[in-house]
């Protein structure tokens, strides 16, 4: 709910004479290339950078930067009113605990009463430091659902920072260099992230000639190569070489490095019981090289660190914060900008206010912007039709789902010649080869579709080797040359799979995907193909996966599919 205070103050600023970005926002809207979710995020980003000078959230809340309550209009004792007026950090906490959520539930009536009674009994500075994890650096999190265009939004932030930094090179609010941590759990996410950012057209958000000038300045680096050759302990870390090539680092401007935090930045770091060891005194060559890279990145001036899919890095969060805190000691870190699909924690946390009082929050506290998943449906996401099979037999569910898909989407061809595709998750390679493929190929033949239009995509085992051209066919699914209509998968494509022409998903049994990934897997088919065009997609589930989908929607987005998210859901016998 802290983001609501930020949004309220942002809106006040945008409509005030102090706002300096009105013409820029008008330009972005006029170009028509950015989604509403992205434009609203840009407004918040620039508000925090310009009006709030890019300061850490704890500092801003202590200074009352987001206070909007008219204390003179509230029923307060004169002493309490005077205290809150003269102590903006207290007024900020008071405003927060008085807020109500979408269910009209107040954050904390108890705390409101306590502040009214004895406002000087709370250490407000400590509360705000604890609320935002005690970090000394700027750490903002943007929560947007899948399909909102988070990677393009990163690119927009990069270009906007450089645009303002060129005009005000000594303004510390704007970053000069950037490192992007691609999702830690996705091994193949680094290069696609880089390509998406490289393909971004800065003239969508910045007028010419500045857009082209900045694009020419940017240099890209992928930090993903192996550390050393096996037979050498003297070979230099190639990632270090890539950064060192940009010497002198003190004058560096416009570097965009993309890497996998887990495999590169957090390499050779151990965490035990909250204690971090970076083996800085180690004689081990791999330890030395890992630290060499970290130390060099820590010298990049005015560095903004972008973390994609923050929820992936939960197990590595302590390590990552330790590394960033070490970099921040050099006074080189401009900010940490995170991106996540959900604002909600797995379980609520307590923020201690006094020995007797605490306030619970189910949201990640450093979220500065939140775009609900439900607002994306029918906007930049296809409108899903969810079918829940009453029968338990996996083969029958697949058979019925494939027939329904072909009945509905057999002749669907999107702009650009992309044919609609169905994804079926199979659990095991044996099931894919021995059960699912025969069923699908038989039904496809009935509809006049060749078996060549069925892609078997898995990594292979002793009995069934990896299909020879499987990876190539998978990589071109979203191109007009692909004639694939059905993709059979085993433990691949659960997340980070960006295929807009995917128009249906079948999960026929428990184990087709990890239990905690049913929502992400089901929603793979919801990315919109043509902007502004009403599109639908089929999600066909057995009852177990439907229950998990519902539970994960409730946990991660606080919505229930039969009531709100999926208007077209049916029980199929």
Across the structure, where does each feature detected by a protein language model lie?
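Conserved pre-motif I regulatory segment
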Residues: 13-143
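Conserved C-terminal RecA-like helicase domain
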Residues: 58-60, 148, 209-243, 250-258, ...
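Motif I (Walker A/P-loop) of helicase-class P-loop NTPases
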Residues: 150-164
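Conserved Walker A/P-loop ATP-binding site and its immediately adjacent core
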Residues: 153, 171-213, 262-263, 427-433
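Interdomain helical connector at the RecA1-RecA2 junction of SF1/SF2 helicase-like NTPases
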Residues: 169, 321-323, 327-443
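Structural recognition of the conserved hydrophobic beta-strand(s) that form the central parallel beta-sheet
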Residues: 180, 257-260, 306, 334-341, ...
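SF2 helicase catalytic motif II
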Residues: 263-264, 273-331
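Conserved RecA-like P-loop NTPase helicase motor core
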Residues: 460-562
């Amino acid at each position: 709910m802290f983001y609501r205070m930020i949004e309220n103050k942002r809106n006040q600023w945008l409509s005030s004479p102090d706002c300096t970005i009105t013409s820029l926002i008008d330009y972005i809207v006029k170009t028509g290339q950015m989604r509403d979710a992205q434009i609203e995020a840009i407004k918040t980003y620039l508000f925090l950078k310009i009006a709030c000078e890019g300061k850490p959230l704890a500092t801003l809340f202590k200074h009352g930067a987001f206070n909007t309550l008219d204390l003179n209009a509230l029923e307060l004792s004169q002493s309490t009113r005077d205290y809150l007026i003269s102590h903006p950090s207290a007024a900020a906490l008071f405003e927060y605990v008085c807020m109500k959520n979408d269910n009209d539930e107040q954050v904390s009536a108890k705390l409101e009463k306590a502040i009214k009674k004895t406002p000087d009994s709370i250490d407000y500075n400590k509360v705000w430091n604890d609320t935002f994890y005690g970090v000394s650096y700027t750490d903002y999190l943007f929560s947007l659902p899948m399909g909102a265009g988070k990677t393009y939004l990163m690119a927009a932030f990069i270009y906007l920072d450089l645009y303002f930094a060129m005009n005000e090179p000594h303004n510390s609010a704007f970053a000069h260099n950037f490192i992007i941590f691609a999702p830690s759990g996705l091994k193949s996410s680094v290069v696609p992230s880089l390509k998406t950012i490289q393909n971004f057209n800065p003239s969508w958000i910045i007028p010419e000639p500045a857009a082209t000038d900045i694009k020419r300045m940017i240099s890209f680096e992928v930090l993903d190569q192996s550390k050393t050759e096996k037979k050498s302990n003297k070979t230099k870390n190639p990632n270090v070489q890539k950064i060192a090539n940009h010497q002198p680092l003190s004058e560096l401007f416009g570097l965009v490095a993309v890497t996998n935090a887990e495999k590169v930045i957090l390499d050779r770091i151990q965490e035990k019981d909250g204690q971090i060891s970076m083996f800085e005194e180690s004689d081990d060559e791999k330890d030395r090289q890992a630290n060499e890279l970290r130390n060099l990145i820590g010298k990049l001036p005015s560095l903004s660190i972008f973390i994609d899919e923050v929820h992936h890095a939960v197990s590595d969060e302590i390590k990552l914060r330790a590394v960033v805190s070490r970099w921040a000691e050099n006074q080189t870190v401009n900010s940490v900008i995170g991106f996540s699909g959900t604002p909600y924690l797995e379980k609520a946390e307590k923020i201690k206010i006094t020995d007797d009082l605490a306030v619970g929050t189910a949201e990640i506290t450093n979220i500065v912007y939140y775009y609900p998943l439900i607002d994306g449906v029918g906007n930049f996401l296809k409108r899903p039709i969810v079918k829940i099979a009453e029968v338990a037999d996996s083969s029958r569910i697949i058979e019925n789902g494939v027939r329904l898909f072909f009945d509905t989407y057999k002749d669907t061809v999107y702009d650009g010649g992309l044919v609609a595709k169905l994804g079926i998750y199979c659990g095991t390679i044996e099931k894919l080869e021995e059960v699912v493929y025969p069923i699908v190929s038989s039904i496809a033949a009935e509809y006049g579709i060749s078996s060549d239009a069925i892609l078997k995509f898995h990594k292979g085992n002793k009995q069934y080797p990896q299909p020879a051209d499987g990876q190539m066919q998978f990589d071109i699914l979203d191109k007009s040359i692909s004639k694939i209509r059905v993709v059979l998968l085993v433990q691949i494509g659960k997340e980070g799979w960006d295929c807009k022409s995917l128009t249906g998903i079948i999960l026929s049994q428990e184990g087709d995907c990890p239990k905690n990934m049913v929502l992400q897997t089901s929603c793979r088919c919801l990315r919109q193909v043509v902007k502004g065009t009403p599109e639908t997609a089929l999600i066909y589930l057995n009852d177990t996966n439907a229950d998990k989908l519902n539970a994960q929607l409730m946990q991660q987005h606080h919505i229930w599919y039969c009531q709100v998210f999926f208007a077209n859901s049916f029980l199929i016998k």
